[in-house]
Amino acid sequence: MLKVWSVVLLLSGLMGSHQVLAYCWDEAASRYDLEPELLQAIADVESGLRVQAINYANRNGTRDIGLMQINSIHLPRLLKQGITEERLLSEPCLSVQVGASILAEFIQRFGYNWMAVGSYNVGPGPGPQREALRQRYAERIWVRYQALIAQRR
């Protein structure tokens, strides 16, 4: 893992931030068997691709942190791995890796489908209201994902 971050730091000195983020999307997607455009679409919808974005507006008192808007509910588990809120705000590739791991957990639970994508934002809880929120979020991701795929062609 240290080798990966060393390469990212080296690349950041040689390339623009957009190209470094492209490396981050690809690296995380490869590690978790995801599409890089899906991760980028999530980051775009979640934070507007802002590395230091913080959202304090969650109804349950949690906050969302960084590029991938990692919910603070994950911090106790992440802290055991040496991942702090400050690192999520200052290391965009780390935010992408953590976001990809969270999405991969939902995919493992629900399959590679829009329920898993919607759970990234809304959580997996039951109920028709939460299901509607998951669906609405997944539709926003789908629109952005399609635009990214079209750009690639």
List each model region and its residues.
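Sec-dependent N-terminal signal peptides
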Residues: 4-14
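Catalytic glycan-binding domains that act on GlcNAc-containing polysaccharides
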Residues: 20-153
